[in-house]
Amino acid sequence: MISVAVNGYGTIGKRVADAILKQPDMRLIGVAKTSPNYEAFIAHRKGIKIYVPQQSIKKFEESGIPVAGTIEDLVKASDIVVDTTPNGVGAQYKPIYQQFQRNAIFQGGEKAEVADISFSALCNYDEALGKKYIRVVSCNTTALLRTICTINKVTKVEKVRATIVRRAADQKEVKKGPINSLVPDPATVPSHHAKDVNSVIKNLDIVTMAVIAPTTLMHMHFINITLKDKVEKKDVLSVLENTPRIVLISSKYDAEATAELVEVARDLKRERNDIPEVMVFDDSVYVKDNEVMLMYAVHQESIVVPENVDAIRASTRLMSAEDSIRITNESLGILKGYLI
C-alpha cells in the first residue's frame, strides 16, 4: 500500500485525492491547502486530513477547520507527493520533496525541466518506471498524446497539425475571461502544446495553434495527422473504439455540443459531471490515403486525473502499464467505445 500526499486541493487536486481513495493499492495521507475556502471545508467534511503552511494554522483553526500538521509533516508522512499547486508553484515546493527524499508527481503547468520525464500513460508509461520526479502533461497535451499514440497503433504517425480551441476558464474561475472575445493563445506558431507533445514523443513533426474562446466547459481540438502508410477509415475508428480513455460520440445521440455532453455526464451520474475520456465525434473522422482528420472534445478538469494515478504507480514501480491502466479505469469507471 503506497502512502500518497496531495499538495493542493483545487480543480485537479480534489479530483486526484478522490481518485486515490478509490485505488486498492493506495492510501491518501491528506491534502495541503493554503486558505480555508469552501474546498477546505468540504475536504474536512469528507474526513480528509488537511495540512497547511505553518503561518496559516491559526487562520484555519479560527475558521473551524482542524489542522493535521504542516505541509512538511504531510510530505514526511507520505511515500510520494502529487503536486497539484498552481502553475509554477510546484517548482517552488520541489526542494521540500528533495529534502525529505520523496518522489513527486508534477502537473503540466510546470516547466518540463522540473521532472525527470514528462508523462502520458498510453504513450510512455514504461519509460517513467522508477523515475523520482514525473510531470503529467497538461490537459490539452494529454488529449493530443492519447489520440496520437492510439492512431500510431494503426501505422506510424509522421506529422501532426492541430488547432486547439481552449476554454477561457474553469467554471469556478470567476475572475478570468474573456467574456466576449476570441484571443490567440498566442498568435505566434507553434503554440506551446507542440513542444509539450515533443517532451514525450521526441522527434514527432507537430505544429499546433491555439485560441481562447469564451466558454468554461471544455476544449475542442481539430487535428490533421499524416501517417506513414495508407489506412482505411474503419481501421481508424476501430482503434479509437477499442482504446481505453477514448470514447466516441455518435450523431445518433443528438448531443454534439459541449454543453450537451456535460448534460450527458449529468444524466450518466458522472461524479462532478466529469468525462476524463477524450470525446471523439465519429462523424468527424475523415480518412484519405495516409491522411486522417478528426475532431474531439476535452474535459479539462478531469482528463489528467487517471494519468496522475498511473504516474504514481510508474514512479514507485508498483505494476506494469497494462495492469495500472486497467485498475485505474475500473476504479474510476473510465470507458472505451461509445459514451452511450
UniProtKB/Swiss-Prot annotation:
Question: What catalytic activity does the UniProt entry give for this protein?
Answer: D-glyceraldehyde 3-phosphate + phosphate + NADP(+) = (2R)-3-phospho-glyceroyl phosphate + NADPH + H(+); D-glyceraldehyde 3-phosphate + phosphate + NAD(+) = (2R)-3-phospho-glyceroyl phosphate + NADH + H(+)
Q: InterPro entries in the record, alphabetically?
A: DapB_N, GlycerAld/Erythrose_P_DH, GlycerAld_3-P_DH_AS, GlycerAld_3-P_DH_cat, GlycerAld_3-P_DH_NAD(P)-bd, Glyceraldehyde-3-P_DH_2_arc, NAD(P)-bd_dom_sf
Q: Which CDD domains match?
A: GAPDH_II_C (cd18127), GAPDH_II_N (cd02278)
Can you tell me which residues form the catalytic site?
C139 (nucleophile)
E.C. number, please? Answer: 1.2.1.59
**Sequence positions that bind NAD(+):** T11, I12, G109, R167, Q300
Cite the entry's keywords alphabetically.
Cytoplasm, Glycolysis, NAD, NADP, Oxidoreductase
Record localization: Cytoplasm
Q: Which Pfam families match?
A: DapB_N, Gp_dh_C
Q: Which GO terms describe its biological process?
A: glycolytic process; lysine biosynthetic process via diaminopimelate
Kindly report, in one word, the top-level EC class recorded for this enzyme: oxidoreductase
> Annotated Gene Ontology MF terms?
4-hydroxy-tetrahydrodipicolinate reductase; glyceraldehyde-3-phosphate dehydrogenase (NAD+) (phosphorylating) activity; glyceraldehyde-3-phosphate dehydrogenase (NADP+) (phosphorylating) activity; NAD binding; NADP binding
Say if the entry is tagged with keyword Oxidoreductase: yes
Cellular component terms (Gene Ontology): cytoplasm
Give residues annotated as binding D-glyceraldehyde 3-phosphate: S138, C139, N140, H193, A194
Subunit-structure text? Homotetramer.
**HAMAP family in the record, alphabetically?**
G3P_dehdrog_arch (MF_00559)
- Record's family? Belongs to the glyceraldehyde-3-phosphate dehydrogenase family.
Protein name stated in the entry: Glyceraldehyde-3-phosphate dehydrogenase
Recorded source organism is: Saccharolobus islandicus (strain M.14.25 / Kamchatka #1) (Sulfolobus islandicus)
Give the source lineage, highest ranks first.
Archaea, Thermoproteota, Thermoprotei, Sulfolobales, Sulfolobaceae
Gene that produces this protein: gap
